[in-house]
């Protein structure tokens, strides 16, 4: 008797999360992922265009989670303290999920947002928090006036 089992995008993404968390982005290959969920590598291409698409999906979910944390954090009134609070949220996330943070911010990924265009156009769900705190501080005189996005990526 032959059984057909449908492995959905959620199960493959879950297995990809486990690989990423245990071994880092270099371990997340289509072949290893397929083997871990019991399907052929070609079957994964129904859910993800390629390995870059898979890694970008994982990174995007991470950015959404980090943005939700930053957006859900009570912020102090002082711009300098607000910036420190946002950076604390980023640091806590990095310590809690180091491999994901590395994928999000340190790994070169095909299709990742490009500086400065994508950031100036508001396409980053996380950088906007740092930029907003810096801009506020510049307007209030807490920080010297400068290019907000250049400073955001130096922070």
PLM feature spans:
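Generic hydrophobic, amphipathic alpha-helix propensity
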Residues: 8-16, 33, 58-66, 70, ...
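Hydrophobic alpha-helical connector segments
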Residues: 71-100, 149-152
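Amphipathic alpha-helical segments used for helix-helix packing
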Residues: 95-114
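Amphipathic alpha-helical packing segments from all-alpha helical-bundle domains
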Residues: 114-140, 149-153
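Short, intrinsically disordered or compositionally biased N-terminal tails of bacterial proteins
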Residues: 1-6
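Helix-turn-helix
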Residues: 11, 15, 19-53, 57
